[in-house]
């Protein structure tokens, strides 16, 4: 049986050959690093002083060397997470590395290292911000379905993303986390801005913890990718990238949305003292399942409070690479 699509190439913004090129990357490093690393929790209050962020031996180049040695082809950096603290000196706030205990522009160092080692750079940006509230209601105060952002916050986010996408050169992926509170029009405006500033980049609106079997239109549309967070693709027959999207009763079209699994190498997104690494067997299973079911794997590898990836993590990645060479393809 032949499956047909309307139009045959799909209604998505990017052509199929561009999306297939992204799929061919296969394996990337998610880098969760920032204020949360120093607070010891993923979701800080946003009231922490900027000076608390103070890596003592920051080595961004080491992160990308480790990724390259592990066989990864791209990397995505958390430029701003829930804390609201920015890894670049933003003109739109004073809550950033320029006022912190280590003034290195981490975003600049990241794209420089990616260029040096031949990895595709990507930027993560979180729409939930506990520091820059501007009247928004966050997940800290209400169930996720009742959160919202104000127009002032959305303007702030777009101004910051414009900085990121015009200051540091080309990026291959823009990863917007917790996009639901932006609202449908807010997401459409954000998507359009990113597509205008970086037309070659794939745009991820994170769906949250799902297995990729269905599109959460009301939370994460529009998007170029399907997020599969802390899950593996549901079907052992493989991830199904074609999704039928009904934007209105009369606007029903097929979109090709490649899948990206994201999960940490341990059990926490950020470095937390005492967090344990997954076993070699589990990590190999994650790699093989993602590959066999037709999705990319964005494996989170968090640097510690020094600003380096710990040696135990480096060795785990090397063993995984060797195991993939033996058992994978």
PLM features: residue spans?
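Mature catalytic domains of secreted/periplasmic carbohydrate-active enzymes
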Residues: 1-329
């Amino acid at each position: 049986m032949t499956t047909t699509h309307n139009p045959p190439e799909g209604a998505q913004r990017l052509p199929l050959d561009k999306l297939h090129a992204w799929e061919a990357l296969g394996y990337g490093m998610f880098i969760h690093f920032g204020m949360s690393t120093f607070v010891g929790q993923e979701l800080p209050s946003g009231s922490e002083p900027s000076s608390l962020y103070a890596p003592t031996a920051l080595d961004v180049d080491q992160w990308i060397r480790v990724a390259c040695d592990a066989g990864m082809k791209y990397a995505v950096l958390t430029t701003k997470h829930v804390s609201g603290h920015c890894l670049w000196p933003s003109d739109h706030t004073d809550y950033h590395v320029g006022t912190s205990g280590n003034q290195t522009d981490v975003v600049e160092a990241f794209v420089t290292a990616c260029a040096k080692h031949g990895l595709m750079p990507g930027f993560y940006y979180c729409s939930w911000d506990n520091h820059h509230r501007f009247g928004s209601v966050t997940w800290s105060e209400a169930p996720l379905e009742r959160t919202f952002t104000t127009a002032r916050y959305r303007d702030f986010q777009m101004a910051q993303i414009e900085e990121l996408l015009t200051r540091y050169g080309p990026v291959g992926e823009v990863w917007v986390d917790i996009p639901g509170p932006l609202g449908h029009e807010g997401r459409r405006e954000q998507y359009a801005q990113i597509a205008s500033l970086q037309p070659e980049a794939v745009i991820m609106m994170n769906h949250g913890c799902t297995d990729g079997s269905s599109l959460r239109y009301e939370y994460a549309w529009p998007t170029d990718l399907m997020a599969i967070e802390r899950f593996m693709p549901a079907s052992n027959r493989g991830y199904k990238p074609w999704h039928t999207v009904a934007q209105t009763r009369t606007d029903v079209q097929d979109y090709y949305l490649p899948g990206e699994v994201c999960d940490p190498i341990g059990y926490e997104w950020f470095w937390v003292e005492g967090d344990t690494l997954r076993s070699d067997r589990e990590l190999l299973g994650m790699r093989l399942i993602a590959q066999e079911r037709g999705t990319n794997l964005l494996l989170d590898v968090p640097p510690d409070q020094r600003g380096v990836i710990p040696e135990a993590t480096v060795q785990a990645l090397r063993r995984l690479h060797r195991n993939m060479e033996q058992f994978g393809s």
